[in-house]
């Protein structure tokens, strides 16, 4: 049986994080002092001056309704930022890149705890979006 040193497995992850491209951390926005509110029927995220971030961030949000509005107010200088929302049953109800100004709605989903996923790919700019029960 071949043994693999733990250090050898961790090295690529450490290098990626040092380069500012954390692929796995929910703290990827921490250096930019994000303001994140996840209250029943109201979710909001804002982070200013984000620079070259690649990450997937997941947030739980309680929606007592079956639909939601999604308001975009994001400024992108490079890269992409995408929001994907899944309902309490795991069905995808929304998937769109964040843009400077947009009022949008999700499709109908099951009430309960929804998942809001923010996918950043080499993103730089100011993130700002809100999701509210419709």
Regions found by a protein language model. Give the residues of each.
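Sec-dependent bacterial lipoprotein signal peptides
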Residues: 1-26
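Transition segment at domain starts
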Residues: 26-62
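Short, surface-exposed binding/anchoring microloops in extracellular/periplasmic proteins
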Residues: 55-76
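Exposed aromatic-hydrophobic patches
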Residues: 59, 102-108
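Noncatalytic modules at the cell exterior or secretory-pathway interfaces
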Residues: 66-72, 106-124
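Short, surface-exposed beta-strand/strand-loop-strand elements in extracellular ectodomains
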Residues: 78-95, 132
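Edge beta-strands of jelly-roll/beta-sandwich modules across compartments, strongly enriched
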Residues: 81, 119-134
């Amino acid at each position: 049986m071949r043994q693999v040193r733990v250090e050898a497995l961790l090295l690529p992850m450490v290098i990626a994080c040092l380069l500012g491209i954390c692929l796995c951390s929910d703290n990827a926005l921490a250096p930019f002092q994000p303001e994140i509110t996840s209250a029943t029927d109201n979710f909001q995220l804002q982070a200013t001056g984000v620079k070259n971030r690649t990450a997937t961030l997941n947030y739980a949000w309680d929606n007592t309704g079956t639909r939601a509005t999604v308001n975009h107010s994001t400024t992108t200088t490079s890269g992409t930022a995408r929001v994907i929302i899944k309902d309490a049953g795991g069905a995808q109800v929304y998937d769109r890149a964040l843009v400077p100004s947009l009022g949008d709605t999700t499709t109908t989903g099951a009430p309960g705890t929804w998942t809001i996923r923010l996918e950043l790919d080499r993103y730089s700019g100011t993130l700002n979006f809100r999701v509210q029960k419709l």
